[in-house]
Amino acid sequence: MITKTLTGELGLREYLSQVDNYCSNGVDSGYVGDYKPEAECIEASKAIYAIALNESLNKYGQDIGLEQVLMENLANILIFSYAADSTLSRVLQNNSKADELPGLCVQAYVAEEGIKVVEYARKIFNSIFDSSNMPKDIKDKFDKLDKRLTLDTDIIGIKKVIGEKTVEAGGYPVKNY
């Protein structure tokens, strides 16, 4: 992915301009429907990934591959973005079923991992900029995206409900979603 970004195959510049619009429009993707906070969290994770990748490439260029810890944090953000997007899509496709468990799982997962994305991004930006030297535009975007990534979800309460439903079912109800 880094190679494709460096060669211009992925269009990072175009996506970054979309991220600028996203951040200047109140960090709202325009999504309407169930699980809006989760959808916005996922979009914010993609945006923060693009900004972190761009700033990493600006600092390290083609030597970015040598920065293993930085690459690990970038990968963690990307893995969350993909897994959460895929999970939410499956839940929305099967939303007509009476089972609320998948929806609860996606709410807990996205809320819990969104907080981790903020931590990963903060580590990346702290390695690129001195804590007091982060450019104002990057800091403003980070602060806006942080609000979308940090959901006001009762993760513990949701996990209790998931546990209770699992016990009621006599184990994890394994279904193909």
Label every model-predicted segment.
Residues 1-177:
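Flavin-dependent oxidoreductase catalytic core characteristic
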